[in-house]
Amino acid sequence: EDIVSDYFKDTFADKEVSYKKKAGEYTENNPVYILYADDKKIANVTLTEKKKNAHKFTEWKLASIDFNVDSKTKNTEHSVKITAPKNSEVTINGVKVSSDYITGEADVSLCKHVGDYVTTPVDDVYNINGMFAKPEVKVTYNGKELDTEYVKDGYEAYYPSDDELLSSEKSHILTVAENYGKYMINRGSLSTLSSYMIGNAKEYMSDIPAIDVYLIGRTFTYDITDENVSNFRKYSDDCYSCDVDYNLNVKWSSGSTTYNISLTYVFVKQNDKWMLADFSIR
């Protein structure tokens, strides 16, 4: 009831309400009108005869109101697209969404290069048409409510975190990230860094030049501060992703600079060992 109430408050607030006969459907015996708020179509209103009054004039009563005006035209602002991890439970305004609304699958974009090693994580894509109010979307996965946000073309629910796995892997994640930074300033080796990698990550790393030209010929020291691992997502028992951020501080005799390192990692488990399968620089 609150959803409907809020919808009408938003729809008619500070608007001029008007109506017109609906061409092609209006007749003297079956009046049909289009209701407007300013220039926006809100509803089709159909009247039916209630009775004849003492003067033989017809008194009318409401027969029906159709609020799906927009969904019958090219306006689709009340359609809802939801992307959620496969086998999730999706609810809209507290009502469970049937699997009948699943229109397809989509690979998780971060994990598009892991298929040679593990099963590629996928999302279910839901499309629900004919909504006349902004929905409240909730997604649960294995009993855990997921982070869900509105993106450019609909709602997206993200795979859950796993505190236990993050705790056991955090040191490993930071070791890989620190070795990346050391390699970039020529204080680490490509062979050491590559030993943590497979697949696309290993190929990508081999194409990145080692040292910033700004440091060539300089004698310098360095340290790493403000390390942080965030957006940890577990897709399965053998695949996860995360963001890694830290500052790589470099000092030399006459100055200093700080490199703000921001990476997104995708790890897969191979032979009981977590390997970096893909990464991107943010």
What is the role of each PLM region?
Residues 17-96, 129, 233-282:
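Exposed beta-sheet edge and beta->alpha loop/turn motif
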Residues 55-69, 144-174:
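Extracellular beta-sheet/turn segments enriched in Thr/Pro/Gly and aliphatic residues
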Residues 47-52, 102-105, 152-155:
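A short, sequence-level motif marking secondary-structure junctions
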Residues 1-16, 87-88, 160-223, 230:
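Core segments of small alpha/beta cavity-forming domains
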Residues 108-145, 152-153:
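Short Pro-Gly-centered beta-turn/loop motif in secreted/extracellular proteins
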Residues 62, 219-225, 276:
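A broad structural signal for short, well-ordered beta-strand segments within beta-sheet-rich domains
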Residues 226-229, 264:
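Conserved beta-strand residues within beta-sheet cores
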Residues 92-111:
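Short, flexible N-terminal segments of the mature chain
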